[in-house]
């Protein structure tokens, strides 16, 4: 029996696959052994004496099934764990994820004019200082701050209105007093004039 090493190599080159994927018909070994050119190999491939084997299926069914189970929390007990908690889920990674969420929210609020740049900077530094443990806490804090700001503004406006009212009342009172004063002065002047005329007439 002759060696078919050359034919196998040429067939692999023509079929563009590995030598392991080439199937040579065992019943036609003599005919295959006589071929020594690519052209003849192509002819044999066309005739079906040389075939490219199909890809061996490497099923991922078990992997998918296991992954699905892990998503539900199976196979993750203490007995399955090898590394430390920090190795399995680094605290730095958790911190980065949290900061990105909080900073994205702050940026969105600043761009939509829900918060001004001063409050943005204040909250940004608070996020960096680990004040807010999640997005909900930050949102609640922002709403609370805005409500406080609105309330203080309303109280300031009310106080200003009250002061304005008092100022106007004082002004009106001063005007009334001044008017009365003028009237009294005019009355006294008139009385003095009448008295002077009466004294002149008596002489």
Curated annotation (Swiss-Prot):
It comes from the Eukaryota. GO terms for molecular function: RNA binding; structural constituent of ribosome. InterPro entries: 60S_ribosomal_eL19_sf, Ribosomal_eL19, Ribosomal_eL19_CS, Ribosomal_eL19_dom, Ribosomal_eL19_dom1, Ribosomal_eL19_euk. GO terms for cellular component: cytosolic large ribosomal subunit; cytosolic ribosome. Keywords: Ribonucleoprotein, Ribosomal protein. GO terms for biological process: cytoplasmic translation. Residues 152-175 are annotated as: Disordered. Residues 159-175 have a biased composition (Basic and acidic residues). It holds the Pfam family Ribosomal_L19e_C. NCBIfam families: PRK08570.1. Belongs to the eukaryotic ribosomal protein eL19 family. This is Large ribosomal subunit protein eL19.
